């Protein structure tokens, strides 16, 4: 077993490179995104929004066993030292928007959802539980089924779309609270990435209900950036302290 910044070997990519290139940054997908987001200290947390979502929190060099429905995992190893994370995965987040578009035919593109959510009646209390394939962390209920509640005669397309966006933020919030309870740490900022983070309504609602700053980077491929950072540190191109400061 090697550290994440170890030199694993070299490659020419089957002749693509004229000289062998060292392989010296190896990380899992979400773990690389955590590193790419600069979550290098205990208490720092990132959320990747995609078809499903992954939330990961750096907890430092001592593992913590969760009692609130998330799992403990390795973050990375550097110089013989291992950092750990709490991790929670959600089955249905961005996929809810696909359901609105492909199955319900309420929208023709994901971009429409922000405007519709802003048009929705703020007094409407429609809620969506997106348990189309059960519920993942922190609920772990494989038998749960999806439901929509609170519909009234005045509930329309905009209100249903808003409920779909809201349910993404509610699930992320439940994971944030679970991790705060497990660690006793107060999370100040949520660093986010993934396609749905371009939705201004969703990101503002996420910030409101978690009462956290939501930091949206300009870059989109945080996993690739994290792996590149790790390789660069191993090769002496990057300095970890400077990366952490930025």
Explain the meaning of each model-derived region:
Residues 6:
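Active-site-proximal segments of catalytic enzyme domains
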Residues 11-246:
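Active-site core segments that coordinate phosphate-bearing ligands/cofactors
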